[in-house]
């Protein structure tokens, strides 16, 4: 059987952003960013109006339908927890009558499926509806599907619990930050301060075209974190990098050793005798730089958008004390993250055994 035999494949749409009334409704409209680490989706960052639905003819995704990203980021999968809508980068897999196929089984099947003919690039990959329709699929009895789902749910449950531990540690670090420094947006403890433009100089990295990309050992950082591994690097040592472009632009992290920084991210230069790296990273994330992004279809932050942002400057000794406490938390996070990798490897092995 092919996917075309089993599924009534459908894509979503994006209403015109030039008509503000299209974006003032309460209908859930899912983009790839809304699918991050969520098996069931019932909400979205953006919503659309009934007027937009009528004007575009966008089809509703019924509750229980499985859907998957197939452009830019292939293979993010979720199940609709309520009736909703999606954009055109997401394929929907309504099951045709006559096929006993569990949505939960299909969820794992799509996560584990190796897509033929996917055009994988440095910063993303693409499929199309024709390629998806031509893929072959087979599945066992509904009872065997449930047994497989139960096993894989057990492993994903372990991963979810460990991710919850990571979130708790993040909350602890954030609590320590507020305890020591107050609210940096209001400078509630009246620390000395200066403007962003007087503290930081931002410089974007270097473009990395698909034809120049060679898989290697060095992480490639783009607007949303690591996007791949290259055989060359353009940065070494300790750096603060800030995502410049994309749904998660404004994310801040400390990166050490050798890596490639693309032009979708900034390297933040500053005087390390005035600001500690880990304090500065935590401060900038607490200030939520994403709120200063423009509102184009592809969000972007810039030097000009951040230049007047207030940056608190506590004594460097206090900053370093905070960093020592945070580094201890980061070590705990690293141990948990490594255990998550182990469980994910086991999950991947089991999915390969069932779906390859």
Descriptions of predicted regions:
Residues 4-9, 16-52, 192-249:
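DNA target-recognition patches
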Residues 31-32, 49-111, 222-285, 294-307:
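A short beta-sheet element
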Residues 289:
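Glycine/small-residue-rich phosphate/adenosyl-binding loop
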């Amino acid at each position: 059987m092919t996917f075309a035999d089993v599924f009534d494949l459908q894509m979503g749409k994006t209403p015109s952003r030039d008509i503000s009334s299209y974006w003032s409704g309460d209908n859930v409209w899912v983009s790839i960013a809304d699918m991050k680490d969520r098996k069931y989706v019932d909400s979205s960052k953006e919503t659309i109006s009934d007027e937009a639905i009528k004007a575009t003819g966008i089809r509703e995704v019924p509750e229980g339908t499985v859907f998957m990203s197939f452009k830019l980021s292939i293979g993010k999968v979720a199940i609709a927890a309520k009736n909703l809508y999606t954009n055109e980068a997401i394929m929907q897999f309504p099951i045709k009558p006559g096929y006993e196929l569990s949505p939960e089984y299909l969820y794992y099947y799509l996560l584990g499926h190796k897509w033929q003919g996917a055009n994988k690039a440095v910063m993303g990959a693409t499929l199309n509806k024709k390629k998806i329709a031509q893929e072959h699929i087979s599945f066992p009895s509904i009872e065997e599907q449930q047994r497989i789902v139960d096993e894989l749910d057990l492993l994903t449950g372990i991963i979810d619990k460990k991710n919850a531990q990571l979130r708790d540690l993040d909350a602890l670090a954030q609590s320590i930050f507020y305890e020591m420094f107050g609210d940096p947006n209001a400078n509630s403890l009246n620390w000395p301060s200066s403007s962003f433009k007087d503290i930081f100089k931002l410089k974007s990295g270097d473009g990395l075209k698909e034809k120049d990309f060679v898989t290697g050992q060095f992480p490639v950082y783009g607007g949303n974190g690591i996007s791949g591994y290259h055989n060359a690097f353009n940065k070494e040592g300790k750096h603060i990098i800030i995502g410049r472009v994309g749904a998660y632009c404004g994310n801040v992290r400390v990166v050490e050793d050798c890596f490639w920084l693309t032009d979708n991210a900034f390297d933040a230069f500053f005087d390390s005798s005035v600001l500690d790296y880990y304090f500065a990273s935590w401060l900038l994330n607490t200030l939520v730089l994403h709120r200063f992004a423009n509102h184009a279809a592809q969000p972007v932050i810039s030097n000009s958008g951040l230049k007047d942002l207030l940056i608190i400057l506590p004594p460097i000794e206090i900053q370093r004390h905070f960093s020592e406490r945070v580094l201890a938390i980061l070590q705990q996070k690293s141990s948990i993250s490594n255990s998550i990798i182990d469980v994910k490897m086991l999950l991947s092995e089991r999915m390969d055994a069932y779906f390859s």
